[in-house]
Amino acid sequence: MNVTILAANLRVKADMPVEIAATVDGETLQVALEWALIERWLGQLANDAGAVRNAIHQRRQAIERVIQSRVYAHGVPISGEMTLGLRDLGGRM
């Protein structure tokens, strides 16, 4: 299974999930990263779009592995949407 995070503009707004796009074997998914996760990673820098982009880039492999695991376990969501949070990535600093 091939999972890739796609480059895109990020919209960063406090208390709102940060949405990224990913492909899973050619199918596009919208992946929402919960705000609590972004805050855990970045603390006070969470409102800085550049810092968020860098944090996602640094954790790209971990994010792709979690997406892959979720798809293996449950299949590609019919809605084309997935949410990842502290439970999924909180320990992957």
Please identify what each model-predicted range represents.
Residues 1-27:
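Short, charged/polar N-terminal "headpieces" of proteins
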Residues 1-3, 32, 50-55:
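A generic short-segment signal for beta-strand/edge and adjacent turn/coil regions
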Residues 2-5, 28-29, 37, 86, ...:
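Intrinsically disordered, low-complexity regulatory segments
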Residues 44-93:
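Acidic, low-complexity intrinsically disordered segments
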Residues 19-44:
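A short, structured beta-strand/loop element
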